[in-house]
Amino acid sequence: MTLKRTLVALAVLLSAFGLFSQQEVVLKITEGMPMINLAIPEIVVRTPTPAAQAAAAEIHQVLSADAAYSRVFQPLPKAYYGYIRPLNPDRIHFKDWDSIQARLLLTGELREDGGRFIFDGKVYDVRSERYIVGKRYQADKAGLRLVAHKMADELMKLHGEKPIFTTKIAFVSNRDGNDEIYMMDYDGAAPTRITFNRIKDYMPAWSPDQRTIAFTSYRAGGAHLYLRNIYEGTETLVSSKGTNYAAAFSPDGRRLAFCSTLTEDGNAEIYALDLAAMRSRRLTYNSATDTAPSWSPTGREIAFTTDRLGAGSPQIYVMDAEGANVRKVSFGGNYHDSPAWAPTGDRIVYVSRVENAFDLYVLNLRTNQIVKLTEQRAFNESPSWSPDGRHVVFSSSMSGSLQIYSVDYDGTNLRRLTDRGENKLPNWTN
């Protein structure tokens, strides 16, 4: 998919409008609680053309996959629907759906009009027989997946969570012969090339508004930071001296933390760039290498990697956003790197080396409990959280070549997202 087609497809979001809904309902669920049983019957096609039938099937498949991925909703098996009457959107028999243990019912209707498809999705609470929310979307064939993702995001909003299904993952790939920046849907679909250079571009990082990607490029001879607006296609050089890498936007989008060798001795230190004034401030002052900054969701702290305990033994530290109050948070083992702060604020995922295997671990900052996410004897690296804190994307050599995978916060539901070329350094929009 080309970038132009991707941006055109995004326009479907602007055509969405809400149907009349009752008072807002927010369903709450916490980790460890049972998931919400969700019924998603086949979409009712009002104009039964082959194109409309295919469009309805695609939307239903993507919606079901999104719900299954959520860790919030449990789609009911299709076989359950055979025990009750077929769905009639004009007269819903809620007792039927309650009999197969559905708590929520998501209905869909679709019609074709002049080569475009109009989809109406509605969500009901089965036990109370209440209509909760409805949405209408219009799209051509290329925008059907986006329609499904947007409807799935409405389900997440009911749960009071950040939507994740319309988010993007930026990454580096050599599938076209050179390391370039790409982006793809959360599930690996619709990979789209962002940069077009004949020299390495790497370490992409999303801005909070999801419009800009910061990255490092060697196009000017050294490793410099650039900002690329993915909608306008414009780029801005924001560093000119030293080696600059590992950029990370602050949650408010006003500052860019990064690692640079700007010091006279060429040592790697962490800086914060004020993006309005375009002035950098040095945050770390240590003879060791300080790198891989990651902001806390409040923007008041930064986690980072440093080998100040000894070369070859990196550890995870945390400091205030102005560089003060530095303290070590990792423990056990002698190699911890690449911290990524969860959007929930209570956890940091990082890479740890044990017996020459690089695996991902999650440290709970409140309890000091550690959960191992990966079990493969491979290079598992560059973790990045989903916006809701329920999933982690990372790159791994478990298949032989570097590819991008996702895994849930508890180490379950491992999924491979890429296959062409080598793919690495993923960064999920926040």
Which residue ranges define each predicted feature?
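Residue-level detector of Asp-centered blade-edge/turn motifs that repeat once per structural unit
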Residues: 163-165, 208-209, 251-252, 297-298, ...
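Short loop/turn segments that connect beta-strands within beta-propeller blades
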Residues: 127, 185-189, 229-233, 274-278, ...
